[in-house]
Amino acid sequence: MSLKLNKYSILELIDTPTELRQLTENKLQTLCSELRLFLLNSVSKSSGHFASGLGTIELTVALHYVYNTPFDHLIWDVGHQAYPHKILTGRKNRIYSIRQRHGLHSFPCRNESKYDVLSVGHSSTSISAGLGLAIASEREKLNRRTVCIIGDGALTAGMAFEAINHAGTIKSNLLIILNDNNMSISENVGALHTQCPQQKKYTNITSDIKKIINSNIYNKNKNTSTAIALFSNLGFNCTGPIDGHNILTLIHNLKNIRNTKTGPQFLHVITKKGYGYKPAEKDPIKWHAVPKFNLKSGILSTNKNIKYTTYSKIFGDWLCQTAMHDNKIIGITPAMREGSGMNKFAQKYPKQYFDVAIAEQHAVTFSAGLAIAGYKPVVAIYSTFLQRAYDQIIHDIAIQKLPVLFAVDRGGIVGSDGETHQGAFDLSYLRCIPNLIIMTPSNAYECKLMLHTGYHYQYGPSVVRYPKGCATNNILYPYNNTTSLYSIPLSKGIIHHQGQHIAILNFGTLLKPAYNVALQLNATLVDMRFVKPLDEMLIKKLTENHQAFITLEENSIIGGAGSGVNEFLVQNKLLIPTLNIGLPDFFIPQGAQREMLSELGLDSQGIYKKIVRWIKI
C-alpha cells in the first residue's frame, strides 16, 4: 500500500526536519493541515494509534521547526502521539507499515531512526532520560537542547515526579512540555487532573482553549494551574498554558524558551485528543488505537471471523457476577479500564472500582491495604506493566501472605505493539516468589474457574495469567455463562489425551495446537494448569511410563514453567530427557499474534517440527 503524496503540496517536499526548517512561518499552518490529512488517510488504511497523534500535529511541527533535530533531542513519553514525528523524520513513505511485521515500530525506537532518541512504549520515562541527556550535554559543552513531551496521563506516575524533583535541584537546561489533553488512554483520574484548569467537555476547541488560557494567565505569584504551581515551586521557569493547536503561538513560545539558559523550563500546552476528526474528538477513548476504518463514515472495521469472547471480557463478566454477591470485592486498574474488560464493572459497581491512574506500584500496595482490612482486591493489569511493581508484589503482598488476586492480562505474544508490550516474562519473574500461586488457563471455562479459585484462596496472593484475544480452545471445554463455578484443587493438572513414550506438559493457551501435535505423535497431553505449585504427583507418575517430556508455554523459556519442571526432575533424580518449548532469549518484535506464533514455532506445525527434530538428535 502506498499513499499519493502529490496532493500534499508542502508535505511531499519534506523528507527530514531540515526541509521543514526552510519553510517560512506562513506556510506552517498549511503543512499542519496536510500532515493531519496524511495521518488520517494512512491510519485509516493501516490501523494504529490515532487520536493522540491528531492532537500533537501543531506541537510536532513547531518542535522540529524551532529545534535543530536530531542534534537537539526530542523525547516523546509513551509514544502514542509520535506518528506525526515519524512522518516528518524520513518515514512518511513507510508509515503504512506501522505495527506490522518488519514495518515501522508502534513507538519511537532508537534502532529505527536517529531522530528517536529514546525507545519508549511504557509511560513516564521521558523526564528521567531527558535529565540524563541534558547533564551529559552540559558536561560535554555541546550546547544541545533536550525536550521531553509528556502527557497529563503519564504525569500521574511516580517515576515522573521523581524525575521532576531531581531536575528542579540540578538546574540543567531541560524543557518539559506538558501535553494537556485531559486524557491518558481512558479519562484521567487523580487530584492533579481534577485541580488542573482543564475542562472535561469541549464544544469548540479554539474557543474553549481561549477560555482556559484567559482564565489562567500566568503571573509571578504562581496562582495558575496546579501543574504550573507544582513545577514552579520545584524550581522550573514556567510558561503557559498556551493553545497547542496554534502553530505561531507555539513557535513564539518555544523560541523564547530555547533562547533562555536559566535552568529547567516547563511549558503547559492545551490540546485536544483526536483534534481535526470529529468522531475522534467526540470519543477519543474509542479512537485511541483503531483498526482500519472508513474515513468518511467513521465506521471501524470489525473482524467477522471472531466467534468467541475475549479473555478480557471473560474476566470482566466474572468480576460483575462475583460483585453481585460480594460487596467486598474491589476491582483495581492502573489506567487500563477498557483494555482489561472493566467497563461494565466500573459502571455497575462504581463504589467497588478504583482506577489509580498510571501507578502500578501504588495499585499493588493499595490492594495490600484493602486485603489487610478484610476486603478482596482484584488487580487487573497487563503482564508488561506488572513488571513495574515487582518490589511491591514481593515486599507488600507475598511476604505478608495477603490474599490479593492478580488478573494478569496480555500474557505471552501481544502482537503489533512489539517488544515493549509482549508478556514474555511474567511466569519467570513471578515463579520465584514464595507464597504465590500461579494459574494458566487454557480456555474460557478454565479462566473463570481459576479466577473463582484465586478469589477464594485466603493463604496468600494468586495470579491468573491469560493472553490477549479470544478464548478459542472450546474444542476441549464446552462452556457458557451459566456453567457452574468451583475452586480447582491446588496444583492439579488434567490428562487430555493418553498416549505413549512422550508426555507434553502444557501451560496455558497453547493447549489447542498441543492437542493436534499429541494426536500426530500419539503423545500424552497434560493441561498442567498450575505453574506454581506444580502437580508433582502427576509428573512423577508420568516419568514411570514415558521416555521423554515436552514442556510448552507462551513465556520465556529461561526461568519459566518448563524450568520449574526441570528443577523438580533434577531435585528428585528423575532423569528423563526434557525439551522446553517457549519464547526464545530475545525481545520478540511486532507482528500479528498468529504470525508471530508461527514464526516462533509455537503453532501446531512449529511445535511438531521442534519435537521431531529434538527426538532425532
Curated annotation (Swiss-Prot):
Binds 1 Mg(2+) ion per subunit. Binds 1 thiamine pyrophosphate per subunit. It comes from the Bacteria. Thiamine diphosphate binds at residues 80, 121-123, 153-154, 181, 277, 360. Its cofactor is Mg(2+); thiamine diphosphate. Mg(2+) binds at residues 152, 181. It catalyses: D-glyceraldehyde 3-phosphate + pyruvate + H(+) = 1-deoxy-D-xylulose 5-phosphate + CO2. Pathway: Metabolic intermediate biosynthesis; 1-deoxy-D-xylulose 5-phosphate biosynthesis; 1-deoxy-D-xylulose 5-phosphate from D-glyceraldehyde 3-phosphate and pyruvate: step 1/1. InterPro entries: Dxylulose-5-P_synthase (IPR005477), THDP-binding (IPR029061), Transketo_C/PFOR_II (IPR009014), Transketolase-like_Pyr-bd (IPR005475), Transketolase_BS (IPR020826), Transketolase_C (IPR033248), Transketolase_CS (IPR049557). One of its GO terms (molecular function) is magnesium ion binding. One of its GO terms (biological process) is isopentenyl diphosphate biosynthetic process, methylerythritol 4-phosphate pathway. Its EC number is 2.2.1.7. SUPFAM superfamilies: Thiamin diphosphate-binding fold (THDP-binding) (SSF52518), TK C-terminal domain-like (SSF52922). The keyword Lipid metabolism does not apply. It is an enzyme of class 2 (transferase). Gene3D superfamilies: 3.40.50.920, 3.40.50.970. One of its GO terms (cellular component) is cytosol. Keywords: Isoprene biosynthesis, Magnesium, Metal-binding, Thiamine biosynthesis, Thiamine pyrophosphate, Transferase. It holds the Pfam family DXP_synthase_N. Belongs to the transketolase family. DXPS subfamily. Homodimer. Catalyzes the acyloin condensation reaction between C atoms 2 and 3 of pyruvate and glyceraldehyde 3-phosphate to yield 1-deoxy-D-xylulose-5-phosphate (DXP). This is 1-deoxy-D-xylulose-5-phosphate synthase. It comes from Blochmanniella floridana.
